[in-house]
Structure formats: structure tokens, C-alpha cells
């Protein structure tokens, strides 16, 4: 009897210990993991026109505004972006998470997105969460972001030799992937452009496109959002099952995936702080 009682006490102690660890994990993942904004800087040597040598691109993604990212966090993000003094700012989807139309939250979001400064231009593509809201296009245009859903833009700086930035809408929009980049491929077939950038939301999409880009920037995966030692990402959304880590080299393309700024599904982050990606591109 004594041994049984001691055994039950031991099991109870183990259960209590695991509960305490789990509660501490949740507290950390919510109160600390979702904070602590970091900047990830990447230096890229590429065959880019000389006039773009030293090009600075800031890459934001997955804000999921009004969940863990609210006005206080937006203010910090904008301050950090403007400290970098970027030439180009890109957003690869999921600015929105819930409906903020006709609310003060929408006006706050507009205010801070307008305050982001870029010397050359600001570009965006939508994400699967943005697709829910018809006002996404108007919102982005009102804050001076050029929308690149299934189109492209020739970007000039100082000289006449441009680079091209193309974009794809979220693959959840039911548009055939080959159709999305049709205009871009028609242009590239007739024009020699030295450096080509693609913006998209779901990184797994690249397996279905013609590999014709030097730099591909994506989001969606949050790099796992909750990552455990020895295990890695706990849950990955459809569209980022294959590609979800920070960086991949695929044939001649460099793919960078943002860990995002906000959270999706659960308001938790572990071993994966919200981040701004900063690319400094130099000529080879």
C-alpha cells in the first residue's frame, strides 16, 4: 500500500511538473515570443545593374493586424523600417486577419503604412487572409503601395537599365498559376532584363512556375511560428509544407521566406521572433 501511494504521488508530481512547464511555455510564447522585433539582414551579391549597387530592400509579411500586432507594435515596425532608410519596401501578404473596415483600427493601419518611406517604391501582393476583404486593394493603394498581384513593374534608378519586380496573388484565389505570370513571361521573352524579383505569399507555389527569377520573396509559413528544439516547426499551413525556413537556393533562384510580424491561428511564437527582413544587394 505504501509503495502504491508513493507511486501515485510520483505520477502526480510528474503531471504537475509538466503542467507547470506547459503553462510557462504558453506564457513565454504569448508575452515574450510575440514581442522582441528583430531585423534579419542578408547581404546578396548578384548580377544587378550598376546603378542599383547597394540596393536596400525591406521585406515585411504576415502582419495579421489586430491580433498580436496593434498600434504600439505598428509604430515600432515603422520606426525600424525608416531607420533602415530602404530603397524599396515589399509586403508579401496577410496584412489583414479580421475585418477592420469602418473601424478606428483601419485608420490606424493606414496611418502607419503611409509613414513607411522608400526612396524608389513600395510594393505588395495579397495573402490568403487578405482575400476575404474586398477593400484590401483600395487600402493598399491609399497608402501608396503598388499592387503587383499577377503583374509586374519595371523599376528604374538613375540610369536607363531597369530591374523588374513581379508579383503573384495568393494561390487560394483559384486563378491558374500559369495565367498569373503570363504578362510577365511575354515581356521577358522580348526584353533582356538583368535582375528579376518575384513577390508571392505561399512559397510552395514556386514548384509550379518557370524558374526565371533571381530573387524570390515569400511569407505565409512564419518560419513555423512555434518551433521546438530537435523537432522544428510544429504546424505548417498549406502552401508552405515544403518551403518554410528562412532561405533556400533553388536552381538559380534565391528564395527568402519571412518569419512574419504577427501570428496566425494561435497568438503564440516560440524560438521564432517577429522580424523584418532587410536585403542589401551588391553587384558581383
Language-model features: locations:
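Membrane-embedded segments
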Residues: 51-154
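Structural motif
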Residues: 57-59, 90, 123, 165-167, ...
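Beta-strand-turn-beta hairpins that frame and shape the catalytic cleft
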Residues: 45-58, 145, 152-167, 192-195, ...
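Conserved beta-sheet core of the metallophosphoesterase superfamily
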Residues: 203-280
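Mobile, glycine- and charge-enriched loop segments
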Residues: 36-69, 187-197
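N-terminal membrane-anchoring alpha-helices
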Residues: 1-50
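Catalytic metal-binding/acid-base residues of hydrolase active sites
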Residues: 64, 96, 128-130, 152-153, ...
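Binuclear metal-dependent hydrolase catalytic cores centered on His/Asp/Glu-rich metal-binding motifs
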Residues: 134, 138, 142-145, 151-152, ...
Amino acid at each position: 500500500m505504501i509503495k502504491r501511494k508513493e507511486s501515485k504521488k510520483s505520477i502526480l508530481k510528474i503531471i504537475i511538473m509538466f503542467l507547470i512547464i506547459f503553462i510557462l511555455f504558453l506564457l513565454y510564447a504569448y508575452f515574450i515570443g510575440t514581442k522582441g522585433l528583430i531585423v534579419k539582414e542578408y547581404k546578396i551579391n548578384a548580377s544587378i545593374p550598376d546603378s542599383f549597387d547597394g540596393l536596400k530592400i525591406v521585406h515585411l509579411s504576415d502582419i495579421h493586424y489586430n491580433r498580436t500586432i496593434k498600434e504600439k507594435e505598428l509604430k515600432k515596425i515603422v520606426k525600424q523600417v525608416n531607420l533602415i532608410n530602404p530603397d524599396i519596401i515589399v509586403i508579401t501578404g496577410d496584412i489583414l486577419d479580421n475585418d477592420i473596415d469602418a473601424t478606428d483600427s483601419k485608420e490606424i493601419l493606414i496611418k502607419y503604412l503611409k509613414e513607411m518611406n522608400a526612396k524608389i517604391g513600395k510594393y505588395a501582393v495579397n495573402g490568403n487572409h487578405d482575400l476575404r476583404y474586398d477593400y484590401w486593394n483600395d487600402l493598399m493603394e491609399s497608402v501608396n503601395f503598388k499592387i503587383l498581384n499577377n503583374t509586374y513593374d519595371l523599376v528604374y534608378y538613375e540610369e536607363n537599365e531597369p530591374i523588374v519586380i513581379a508579383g503573384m496573388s495568393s494561390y487560394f484565389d483559384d486563378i491558374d498559376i500559369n495565367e498569373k505570370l503570363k504578362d510577365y513571361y511575354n515581356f521577358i521573352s522580348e526584353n533582356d532584363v538583368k535582375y528579376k524579383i518575384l513577390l508571392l505569399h505561399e512559397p510552395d507555389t514556386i514548384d509550379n512556375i518557370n524558374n526565371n527569377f533571381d530573387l524570390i520573396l515569400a511569407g505565409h509559413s512564419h518560419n513555423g511560428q512555434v518551433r521546438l528544439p530537435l523537432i522544428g516547426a510544429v504546424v505548417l499551413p498549406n502552401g508552405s509544407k515544403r518551403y518554410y525556413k528562412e532561405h533556400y537556393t533553388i536552381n538559380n533562384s534565391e528564395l527568402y521566406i519571412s518569419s512574419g510580424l504577427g501570428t496566425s491561428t494561435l497568438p503564440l511564437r516560440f524560438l521564432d521572433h517577429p522580424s523584418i527582413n532587410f536585403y542589401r544587394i551588391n553587384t558581383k
